[in-house]
Amino acid sequence: MFYSIVAIFVGAGLGALLRWFLSIGLNALLPEVPLGTLVSNLIGGYLIGIAVVAFATRAGLPPEWRLFVITGFMGGLTTFSTYSVEVMTHATQGEFGWALAVAALHLIGSFTLTGLGMWTARAWLAPA
């Protein structure tokens, strides 16, 4: 149990730091669509697609690795609450087009990149 807690704790901290760095570096580029949150969610979608397939095909890995990557790192990197606030901020300001655009970018982009990540992992991990 101790190693599971440490794996989640460290993974979440690293994921959250990456999200923060992305926000610092990208949010000012396009204030209407905070790119730090979007890029965090898109990267997270892609990486979790890879991780799910990789862990499914690598049964011998210790369970702490899955907890570190999926529960910890991806949980710290991706954010539904910040995305929700950004969409609702546009909506409450009457910017319904921007609200819809931000929502669509996150949802469609994340689903697309998760699928791409799964495809990538299957291609990498396929028997030669």
Swiss-Prot record:
It is a multi-pass membrane protein. Its main location: membrane. GO terms for biological process: cellular detoxification of fluoride. It comes from the Bacteria. GO terms for cellular component: plasma membrane. InterPro entries: FluC (IPR003691). Na(+) is not transported, but it plays an essential structural role and its presence is essential for fluoride channel function. Keywords: Cell inner membrane, Cell membrane, Ion channel, Ion transport, Membrane, Metal-binding, Sodium, Transmembrane, Transmembrane helix, Transport. The chain crosses the membrane at residues 5-25, 35-55, 67-87, 96-116. It is found in: Cell inner membrane. Na(+) binds at G75, T78. It catalyses: fluoride(in) = fluoride(out). GO terms for molecular function: fluoride channel activity; metal ion binding. Fluoride-specific ion channel. Important for reducing fluoride concentration in the cell, thus reducing its toxicity. Belongs to the fluoride channel Fluc/FEX (TC 1.A.43) family. This is Fluoride-specific ion channel FluC. The gene is fluC.
